Amino acid sequence: MPYLDLSPDFKPYYEIHDATDPWTRPQTIVFVHGFTESTEAFRAWVPYLSRQYRVVTYDLRGFGRTAPVDSDFTYSTELYVDDLVRVINHLAGEPVHIVAFKSGGISTMRLAATRPDLVRSITLACPPMVAPGGADWQPFMEAHGMRAWARKTMPSRLGKDAPPRAIDWWTDLMGATSITTARAYLRWVGTTEAGKDMPAITCPTLVILTKLSEQTNVAAGQVPPETVQKGMPHAEIKLLDLDCYHPAASHPDLCAPVMLSFLQKLA
């Protein structure tokens, strides 16, 4: 399995999907997943994009096949940005398009704000503009385990009409995260305010949102689309009439074509 040897404590698992014509020089898309996810979260998106773009996915520090971290590990937005910079430099070597799911948008927005030289565009799928995370998440994880937490929170994540087998699959994926990583991540993510980076972002930006409601968005850190538009007047906003806060997972066949159309307009 491919791993990047970036530092003694960060050797991320990664995948490259490239179905472009071998005589062309495609641009690169880098995916950044959210809490308790991995490269597997992008599997339905890759076929839409890999015929025209070189697609890079990787497991963030602490998640998937990248090594877990200890409970007392100190996550920070700056650390995740540095990790992302090193992945881009090693696997692309030039500016990239970035697609971020949920809290993956925190480091993506900071990178776009502070290192515009590395970013062609960003696509943010339901990013948390204020601190995400339910107050009862960690106590429930500690009492019942990661898999039970994943299943309990799945209806708001995927929507009330999500097929049972989809709920099972995402529960297995997200429930595999180490409780030590979850403790460290939640301690960090609860302090973030990604929305403050919006005014500094100038690259082409697509934001995919779902309708705001307490039921679906209280734990996701989302804000009304008007707030996003005010913070990033240049952004293209796609508002989906769905009762979930993770449409990139629940409705990839809606979201991925929107993103592909957005990129094609930049060409």
PLM feature segments, named:
Residues 1-30, 51-54, 176, 236, ...:
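Alpha/beta-hydrolase fold catalytic core
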Residues 7-10, 21, 40-50, 56-99, ...:
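Active-site loop/oxyanion-hole signature of alpha/beta-hydrolase fold enzymes
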Residues 26, 34-37, 102:
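Active-site glycine-rich loops that stabilize anionic/oxyanionic intermediates
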Residues 31-34, 57:
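Structural cue for short, hydrophobic secondary-structure segments
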Residues 36, 60-64, 129, 244-247:
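Alpha/beta-hydrolase active-site loop signature
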Residues 106-114, 118-148:
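Flexible "cap/lid" loop of the alpha/beta hydrolase fold
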Residues 144-200:
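Conserved alpha/beta-hydrolase catalytic His-Asp/Glu region
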Residues 202-254:
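Conserved loop-alpha-helix segment in the C-terminal half of the alpha/beta-hydrolase fold
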